[in-house]
Structures are given as C-alpha cells and as structure tokens.
C-alpha cells in the first residue's frame, strides 16, 4: 500500500446484461484521511444517471463494510455536487457539515479542493 492508503475494494456497476454503468469503491478502516475523503466513492456514466444506481451500490457496500466489522462510514461530496448530496440524503446519512480540508490534504494539494460536505452512516 502507498503511504497513508488503506485496503479498498473497487467494483464496476453493471446491469443484468453486464453493461458497465459506472464504478464504486469501498475503503476499509478509519483515519483522518478517510474522514475527509470518505469510505465510499462512486460514479455513474451520464446516460444511466437518475435511476438510483449509486444508492443501490452504496447499500451493497454498506453490507460489505459490516463484514469488516465497520460500525460507521463517511461519504464525502463536493458541497456543490447536488446529485451526490441528494444520494446521501436518500440513504439517510447524517449531514455533519461542510468542513475545510487541511492544508496538507491530498485533495487540497492535487485537486485544488478546499471543502467537503461530510455525511455519516451508522451501519
């Protein structure tokens, strides 16, 4: 593992015919980096959006996280990503607030991001 990285799963999100519609991943463990970066990431190809595929994938990842004895997860979004914020609300995540990224955070350094909306999910 690279420095400060954690074990993770990555999956394609596919329909019943095997067509790839997007991707999702689950990061295992707890750290300051995961508070800001989140345990779950997802992306859905534009033509498949609006069908709750991200939410369905998250529900499956919640079950996988339980198998790793995780008691809660964070999903973080860019504050202006209304679609992802709606997914977190749809999944009944607890909105913890909008947090400023630390100066030494990779997302701040590499991606020029400054803030994250953070949602907590008790499993």
PLM feature spans:
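Acetyl-CoA-dependent GNAT
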Residues: 1-35
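Short hydrophobic/aromatic beta-strand element in the GNAT-like acyltransferase core
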Residues: 8-12, 23, 41, 74, ...
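Conserved acetyl-CoA binding element of GNAT-fold acetyltransferases
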Residues: 23, 35-46
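Conserved acetyl-CoA-binding loop-helix of GNAT-fold acetyltransferases
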Residues: 42-44, 50-67, 86-90
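Conserved GNAT acetyl-CoA-binding A-motif
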Residues: 65-76
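Conserved catalytic-core motifs of GNAT/GCN5-like acyltransferases
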Residues: 76, 94-111
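Conserved active-site alpha-helix within GNAT-family acetyltransferase domains
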Residues: 80-97
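Ser/Thr-rich low-complexity repeats and stalk/linker segments
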Residues: 114-122
């Amino acid at each position: 593992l690279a420095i400060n990285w954690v074990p993770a799963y990555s999956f394609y999100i596919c329909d019943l015919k095997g067509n790839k519609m997007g991707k999702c991943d689950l990061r295992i463990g707890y750290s300051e980096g995961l508070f800001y970066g989140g345990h779950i990431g997802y992306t859905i190809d534009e033509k498949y959006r609006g069908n709750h595929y991200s939410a369905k994938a998250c529900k499956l990842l919640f079950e996988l996280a339980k198998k790793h004895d995780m008691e809660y997860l964070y999903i973080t979004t860019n504050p202006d990503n209304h679609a992802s914020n709606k997914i977190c609300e749809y999944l009944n995540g607890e909105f913890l607030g909008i947090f400023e990224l630390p100066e030494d955070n990779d997302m701040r350094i590499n991606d020029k991001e400054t803030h994250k909306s953070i949602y907590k999910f008790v499993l």
